[in-house]
Amino acid sequence: MPSKLAKARDSYLLLAALLAAPWCWLAFAYLTGRTFYGEMVHASGDWAVWCLMAALAVSPLRSLFPRRAWTAWLLPRRRYLGVAAFAYALLHAAVYVLRQGDLPRILAEGLAAGLLTGWLAFAIFVPLALTSNDGSVRRLGRAWKRLHRIVYAAAVLTFAHWVLTAFDPTTAYLHATVLAGLESVRLVAWARRGRSVATGGSPFPH
């Protein structure tokens, strides 16, 4: 029988709870006055980016380590990371909207490049989060993968939002560089698979 540790490792419910725990703490701390607006905006934004980066890093890591059990473990859990990214982005946006409290002001500020990129990224995340379930995968078929490829556009917009609104964008550039490096690995692996298939070789990375 599987050990308790193995059951915990494979529990999707536990993973969801771990991803939700910081969200719950951030919301509680803000509502009870333990954190201020600026701290809340930064923290929720950071968590959104971290979860997004983790979700996008799964495929490159699988390309780098195709036979490792931990990358196989990550693959079916990628959607949880994506939904968590949306949940933190939702918290990030909600805090901003509630703070402004005035729709005309929100709309006016939303036209600035720094905020417009954030709103566009958030708009892309909505359909991705709503279709991150097995039922949507079955109903949409091949269209599901095509839809979810727009996450890369959301990632670009997210980092643009971060760079344009940060007092010091150095951290944003560092995160973007790490993600770009991982994605370049995925693209190289994809190109190699294409050449391998064209020459009759294995379509899987070695």
Language-model region placement:
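Membrane-embedded alpha-helical bundles that constitute the cytochrome b-like, heme-associated redox core
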Residues: 1-206
